[in-house]
Amino acid sequence: MDPDRQSDIAALDTTLTTVERVVNVDGLRGRIQQLESDASDPKLWDDQARAQKVTSDLSHAQNELRRVEELRSRLDDLPVLYELAAEEEGAGSSEAFAEADAELAKLREDIAGMEVRTLLSGEYDEREALVNIRSGAGGVDAADWAEMLMRMYIRWAEQHDYPVEVFDTSYAEEAGIKSATFAVHAPYAYGNLSVEQGTHRLVRISPFDNQSRRQTSFADVEVLPVVETTDHIDIPEGDVRVDVYRSSGPGGQSVNTTDSAVRLTHIPTGIVVTCQNEKSQLQNKVSAMRVLQAKLLERKRLEERAEMDALKGDGGSSWGNQMRSYVLHPYQMVKDLRTEYEVGNPAAVLDGDIDGFLEAGIRWRNQKVDDE
């Protein structure tokens, strides 16, 4: 094997060893054994919430271990591929070298993707994520754009086998949605998706314009960590006003004959949360309270960050402006305005292929932290 290829394999081995140490492979195996033991308890399903968490945690732990073990196995096999390629080249064939080089390139890409996991070391990065999407300027096109974004994130979660729980969807009159709130139930979902927070811009020929004019639409994405009991977000009962109403679907049609939808208003802050996707008023109230707790936790974090920025004499960083542009006409390109990462296949991106954007965003964010 030539020195360049040997050097590449050695560098990948160093990176993967770091990943294995951060992931704690031995600890992960022990956790899987414990979760398997918990899952085999016949009384587990007496508590459905706990049972769902145990089975979800077990699935994600098994998937993470499998990813690391597969990468290690492929890396260990790579020198053998090159040895076989050298033998075949002596017999007059160079195809085997091309195949080995292709595997080296793919392995480099896959290990880099797994390496991003080691960069998720923030206080809440391990948490599940709450995602809020709101249509912005652009009328019916903006509402349609908000729904397209919702589908993009749900497709991303589905591709990774991450369960999604939709808490609330407020439909627009003509098409699309005014807003939506959903949870992605997976370890590190918040760490990954938090870089998606900001304003997303769509440029396309409007399907709602009878003159087929180009339209620019905006939608805002907010990503929050799911609150845990250790966060101590206590909300006095008197601080919350509870309103109930009937759930509605697309075009304002009623989808429930009872007042099962719930709107919570946090009186001290004015934060409003709605939930209508559960069948009962009680379930909707519980879900809405979880979202309200997450919003209050984020508010607390932002206040603490503002205080630190003031002490440092720093204006702070803003995530609220345009962070990504999706152009479908006159050319096709999705470009992140912070990282410069871009993809010329918007259809794939809108179908959930956003890992490249997430990885670039996480690296960009960590570099900003290092520079401060």
UniProtKB/Swiss-Prot annotation:
Q: How is it modified after translation?
A: Methylated by PrmC. Methylation increases the termination efficiency of RF2.
Q: Which locations, inside or outside the cell, does it occupy? A: Cytoplasm
Among InterPro entries, the record links this protein to:
PCRF, Pep_chain_release_fac_I, Pep_chain_release_fac_I_sf, PrfB
Domain of life, per lineage: Bacteria
Ordered alphabetically, the record's keywords are: Cytoplasm, Methylation, Protein biosynthesis
What's this chain's function? Answer: Peptide chain release factor 2 directs the termination of translation in response to the peptide chain termination codons UGA and UAA.
Question: What is the protein's name according to its record?
Answer: Peptide chain release factor 2
Specify the taxonomic lineage: Bacteria, Bacillati, Actinomycetota, Actinomycetes, Mycobacteriales
